[in-house]
Each structure stands twice: as C-alpha cells, then as structure tokens.
Curated annotation (Swiss-Prot):
Species, as recorded: Pan troglodytes
Gene responsible for this protein: EOGT
One function term, GO molecular function aspect: protein O-acetylglucosaminyltransferase activity
Record-given protein name: EGF domain-specific O-linked N-acetylglucosamine transferase
UniProt-annotated location(s): Endoplasmic reticulum lumen
Family: Belongs to the glycosyltransferase 61 family.
Chain span(s) of sequence motif Prevents secretion from ER: 524-527
C-alpha cells in the first residue's frame, strides 16, 4: 500500500494529509454539509482549480445540496498548469511577452513558454517531474524519502530525528548537525543516488547538508516505540532567510506556497518547523503572514532538543535562495511579464489574512508614497513632490512610513492593496508591490543603479513598473558612503525634478485608467 503512496507522490496523485485529504462525511447529520467546505479557505477564483486536483471533494459537492461551490463544478477543466492532464487553454494564467529576447530564443511563443517554466506554474511542474524515490518502503509502517533534484524539496514519512546529542553554536545552518543514525527511516536507501545530489549544497539552496546523513535504520521508529515524541500532523521544515527584510523573507513565503502546490495541500492544520541549528531566536517583522499557512506558532527546531522525535509526514520546503529558484537573483528572460503563480500567491495571502479591496473610487486614483525614516535613500524634496501631486484633483494622496513599531504588517497590507499608484525609493519596502491590485502601477522613484530587482519582481507579479530615466533631473545629496565599499548610490539621499516627476506619475495614472481590470471605463479628462 505504501508503495502505491510513494509512486502516487511521483505521479502527483496523492496530497499531503490534512484538510484536502479528509474523507468526506457521507453520513452527516441532516441539515449539515457532507464536507467541511469552510476549511478550504481559498479565494473564489481558485476554487475550480482546487476541485480539479481534488475530485473526491468535487464528487461530494455534486451530491451535496449544501455545497457552496456548485457553480464551479462546470469548470473542472480549469487547472494550475503543472498537472499532466492540464491543457494550456485551461491554465490559471499565461505570461505575456512583448518582444523576443534573442539571447534566449527566437519566437514570442517560445519566450512565453520559457518564462512560464522559469517563474510560473511551469516551475512547479519541473519540480514534480524531477521527483524520485531515495528511500523505498516495503511495508505500510515503513518510512520513505522522495526528493526533487539537488534535494531542493523532499518529502518523508515516518521520519526519525535523534536530537539527544546535538551541539548548537552560532551557526544557523551547521552542515554536520546530524551524524549517521541520527536522521533516517526504515526503508531501502539508495545511498549512491542520495550522495550524487550534492552539487548545489548550500544553506539556503538545498537540503543536502541536512539529509546526507539520512540512514537506513534497522528499526521502525514509530512502530517499535523508538520516539520520545511522535508528531502526527503534517510538518513543513523551512530554512529561513532574513526575517527583518521583506524582500528576502517573502522568498520564504513564495517558496512555501509553491511547496503547497507540489503537495496539492493548502491545509493550515500543519506545523511549520524552522530548521535552525543555532541557539538564537529569529527576528520576524512579518510574522502575521504565517497565518496564511498554519494555525499554529512557528516551532524552532531547538524545541525538540534532547529528544528523539518522529514525524509521520514531513516536507522539506523549497528554499529561498535556490539557484534558478524564485525569486532571489532569478535570471529571467526579458520582455515577458505577468505570472499566474505570483498573482495566485498574492490572492492566497490576502484572502487568508482578510485583506479586502475597498475601492477603487470613481473619479479618484489612490496614490501612496512610501517614505523612509532610515539614514539613506530619503526623498529630500518629498513635500514639494506631494504638493505637486495634490494639484491634480483626481489624485488622493497619502504618505506612509512602514515602520513596524508604529504600523502593523496587516495594516501595511491594507494600505498597499488599496493603492493604485505606489511610489517609493529603491528598498525592501517595494516588495509590497506583490499585493497591489492588478491594475496598479509601481513607481520606483530611483533604482540606485540596481535596475533589475524590483523591475523583475513587478514583471513576476504583473503590475506596471516605471522608474526614473533622466539622470540630469535627479540630484543626489553626495556620492554615497558605503561602510566598506566607498562611494555607492544606495548610501545617499536624493531630490527630484518636480516637472519630470509629475510627467512620470501621470504616465502611471494613464496606465491605471486604461487597464482592462480598472472598474471605471469612462475617460478621466481631468488628467
């Protein structure tokens, strides 16, 4: 039976246990639904895609007069894109390419396909196609280990961790944390294949360092009572990037979301364990976001120190800085934008955090300027720029400073999601562009010679991006003073030509008004 389970993982026919795999209650109390539909907690637009991959729930819904999703049963051909049976015309979305990057390919069609595989649900499909069994179970109570290439993602059953003798220091990602016999399972290990997957061994790129000591045990950890603690709930292991930087931390969250797709499970009845081999804590300015993925507090690995811990189902999540991963330093083909994956991620997070769209307002464009209270990259003539914006009657202007001590992250998201033009200097705060409405524009006031970072993120999300172009109309305070590198454009402050600024903002406004998803189609002649 477990053999079928493992092969099911390879074929993407089995989901991680949790809400998606809960057996429908076909003997429910009269007047009660046959399934706990409220546990699905997905945006309405995502429901047909969920039902496509969970046909058992679709079948129950069809029979259940109380199912709220009956209208979606006629759309079961809709699919995310990574499913083997998914036809391109039914995918959640498809990128748009405006020109061909001849360094990559020679047709628009192939450019779209490349971008889809680099940064859209095609990326999830490639991870699924890489899956192979590294530790083969023979019986139902055995363990298993299934991984993608380079051990960037793994899934284990009946996993044994022995933390009785571990030693912690200042290193968050020790490579020799476990010795032979301290991590493993009762299954037939293909040690040769396991050891061949270490080419990308690196803390935030692979799980090879953690799993290279995986051992074929001569006992069944749970059945033979070798565990001090047995974790029944599905558990995600994650190695986290910087929790104080939104750009880096959201590489964690997007990869957790992709991992959920690979598992075909969006249940929040799961544990998340932060894999950290140090004794330190973890500063997290965006901890509210975890509520989109789990009902429980994030667990530090050190919680289990001095114990033998067994996990019935464990997932080693995709990592934040993988080579050719998403979205840190990802090489992307030029000329393409708008991935369904990043749009779905934004919708998923906003839905689960109860962030709603309160507008837009007819006759108004909501403009938000992100101010900086840091030492560098301040807008020196900010008041002058704001006063110029206020001369346009259709602009509703607000200035915000996303300081976590004064404005919680959920409140920040509410402001961002209810913004039509988002303006800010180069910096991690621009990662908020992920949560702008589809019709919005982001104006990176000055990119400080880091041209690709937020341009590429805007392309991934599918929102319009503009930045300052005329160097003779931006005025740095000085040449910048990096602590070790000397002169550096990110380490100074700037003022801007007001006329050029207004020209660019009006361009952004024109894009907003012309966007197909802008609810008000009439002309705004006042602009």
């Amino acid at each position: 039976m477990l053999m079928l389970f493992v092969f099911g993982v390879l074929l993407h026919e089995v989901s991680l246990s949790g809400q998606n795999e809960a057996p429908p209650n076909t003997h429910s109390i009269p007047g009660e639904p046959l399934y706990n539909y409220a546990s699905i907690r997905l945006p309405e637009e995502h429901i047909p895609f969920f039902l496509h991959n969970n046909r058992h729930i679709a079948t129950v819904c069809r029979k259940d007069s109380l199912c709220p999703y009956k209208k979606h049963l006629e759309k079961l051909k809709y699919c995310w894109g990574y499913e083997k049976s998914c036809k391109p015309e039914f995918r959640f979305g498809y990128p748009v390419c405006s020109y061909v990057d001849m360094g990559w390919t020679d047709t628009l069609e192939s450019a779209e396909d490349i971008f889809w595989k680099q940064a859209d649900f095609g990326y999830a499909r490639e991870r699924l196609e890489e899956m192979h069994v590294l530790c083969q179970p023979k019986e139902t109570s055995d363990s298993s280990l299934v991984c993608s290439r380079y051990l960037q993602y793994c899934r284990a059953t009946n996993l044994y961790l022995d933390l009785r003798n571990i030693k912690r220091n200042h290193d968050r990602f020790m490579e020799d944390f476990f010795q032979s016999g301290e991590i493993g399972g009762h299954c037939k290990l293909d040690i040769r294949t396991l050891m061949s997957e270490g080419q990308r061994k690196s803390p935030l790129q692979s799980w090879f360092a953690e799993l290279q000591s995986y051992t074929q045990l001569n006992f069944r950890p749970i059945e033979d009572a070798k565990c001090d603690i047995v974790i029944e709930k599905p558990t995600y292991f994650m190695k986290l990037d910087a929790g104080v930087n939104m750009y880096h931390h959201f590489c964690d969250f997007i990869n957790l979301y992709i991992t959920q797709h690979v598992n075909n499970s969006f249940s929040t009845d799961v544990y998340i364990v932060m894999w950290d081999t140090s004794s330190y804590g973890y500063g997290d300015l965006f901890s509210d976001t975890w509520n989109a993925f789990t009902d429980y507090d994030v667990i530090h690995l050190k919680t289990y120190d001095s114990k033998r811990v067994c996990f019935k189902e464990a997932v080693f999540s995709l990592l934040p800085r993988m080579r050719y991963g998403l979205f840190y330093n990802t090489p992307l083909i030029s000329g393409c934008q708008n991935t369904g994956l990043f749009r779905a991620f934004a919708q998923h997070v906003l839905h689960r955090l109860n962030i709603t769209q309160e507008g837009p307002k007819d006759g108004k464009i909501r403009v938000t300027i992100l101010a900086r209270s840091t030492e560098y990259r301040k807008i020196l003539n900010q008041n002058e720029l704001v006063n110029a914006l206020k001369t346009v009657s259709t602009f509703e202007v607000q200035i915000v400073d996303y300081k976590y001590r004064e404005l919680g992250f959920l409140d920040q998201l509410r402001i961002t999601h209810n913004t039509d033009i988002f303006i800010g200097m180069h910096g991690a705060g621009l990662t908020h562009l992920l949560f702008l409405p589809d019709w919005a524009a982001v104006f990176e006031l000055y990119n400080c010679e880091d041209e690709r970072c937020y341009l590429d993120l805007a392309r991934l999300r599918g929102v319009h991006y503009i930045t300052w172009r005329r160097q003779n109309k931006v005025f740095p305070q000085d040449k910048g003073h990096h602590p070790t590198l000397g002169e550096h454009p990110k380490f100074t402050n700037y003022s801007f030509d007001v006329e050029e600024f207004m020209y660019l903002v009006l361009q952004a406004a024109d894009h907003v008004l012309q966007h197909p998803k802008w609810p008000f189609k009439k002309k705004h002649d006042e602009l």
